[in-house]
């Protein structure tokens, strides 16, 4: 493929698919509680695999690379009384740890076996009624482990109480899960490091069909923020809320503070517009803790590289245990476009900007 530098077309309007994070949570909630009609569902492979798994009658579920599906479905199948399920995935998925979640579920009374290596998929899950309610879990682990438990909490006979030990990673994703539980009628509390989910009561839950329109995906929006920052042209994005459930909506602040891209919301049209400030003075460097929004760090680093802004980004420990080691992958790809970097277990720092490689 031959790429030639060109000018960005201004004032274009883009429709982005629904948030993967919201969609995957909704698919579980709809299956557990019913009466939810989902609009603007994510077209991501993760969400498609989640839908397929929830509809499957097979004893074996293969979720390929879909980490969210692996985690959410592990808890879901653990409470499907009388049903035995084997959940597996790609070779990379079999290298991604799941022990913290399995240990927590076993503490609650779930019956789960490792079929190959302890602490890793594939899993054999024998669904049963769970009556225990209290569990402790390290707070620094992936928020998806914790959200997985929260989503089933309302279906447990005595509810669920989780004590999070240590500093919480990706807190906005936990808050998203709890807000969504509230929206569908599941009562919950989050005080300091303790989360409580109260047992589902029919009177609290919506009795008629609930229409839930999924707002578009802020992680996907990051690419268009990057285009606006580099190309300095306006871009309109549809189906975004001013007050978003998604932690990655912090994009608005990051791209304004460091790259001069202003976000204007139009609630009447359910749209946001990205306006690059042409007189913006770019900072001499950027330092940012992205512990609460690690998934957009790659886009931020690419944007900073294109604009030749030295950067130091921390809070990225979870990127090393994704479908690939995203920190190593990011370092390799940035080198191709002229940015030498230094990485640690949870950070990346730019060292030098040079010319991009001729052939990438």
PLM feature segments, named:
Residues 1-360:
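Short, structured segments at the rim of ligand-binding sites
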């Amino acid at each position: 493929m031959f790429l030639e530098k060109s000018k960005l077309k201004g004032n274009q309007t883009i429709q982005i698919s629904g948030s993967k994070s919201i969609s995957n949570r909704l698919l579980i909630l709809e299956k557990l509680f019913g009466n939810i009609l989902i609009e603007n569902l994510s077209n991501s492979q993760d969400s498609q695999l989640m839908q397929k798994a929830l509809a499957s009658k097979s004893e074996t579920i293969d979720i390929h690379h879909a980490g969210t599906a692996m985690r959410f479905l592990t808890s879901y199948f653990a409470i499907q009384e009388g049903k035995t399920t084997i959940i597996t995935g790609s070779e990379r998925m079999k290298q991604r740890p799941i022990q913290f979640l399995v240990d927590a579920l076993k503490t609650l009374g779930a019956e789960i076996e490792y079929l190959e290596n302890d602490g890793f998929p594939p899993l054999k899950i024998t669904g049963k009624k769970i009556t225990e309610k209290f569990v402790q879990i390290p707070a620094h682990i992936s928020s998806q482990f914790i959200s997985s438990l929260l989503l089933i909490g309302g279906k447990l006979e005595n509810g669920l109480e989780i004590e999070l030990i240590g500093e919480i990673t990706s807190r906005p994703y936990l808050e998203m899960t709890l807000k969504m539980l509230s929206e569908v009628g599941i009562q919950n509390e989050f005080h300091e490091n303790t989360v409580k989910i109260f047992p589902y009561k029919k009177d609290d839950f919506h009795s008629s069909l609930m229409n839930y329109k999924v707002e578009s995906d802020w992680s996907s929006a990051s690419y268009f923020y990057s285009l606006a920052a580099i190309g300095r042209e306006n871009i309109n994005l549809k189906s975004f809320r001013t007050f978003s459930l998604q932690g990655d909506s912090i994009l608005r602040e990051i791209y304004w503070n460091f790259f001069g891209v202003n976000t204007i919301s139009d609630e009447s049209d359910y749209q946001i517009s990205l306006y690059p400030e042409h007189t913006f003075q770019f900072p001499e460097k950027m330092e940012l803790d992205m512990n609460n929004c690690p998934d957009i760090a790659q886009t931020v680093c690419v944007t900073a590289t294109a604009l030749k802004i030295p950067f130091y980004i921390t809070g990225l420990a979870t990127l090393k245990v994704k479908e690939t080691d995203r920190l190593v992958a990011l370092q390799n790809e940035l080198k191709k476009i002229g940015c030498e970097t230094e990485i640690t277990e949870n950070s990346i720092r730019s060292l030098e900007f040079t010319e991009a490689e001729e052939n990438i």
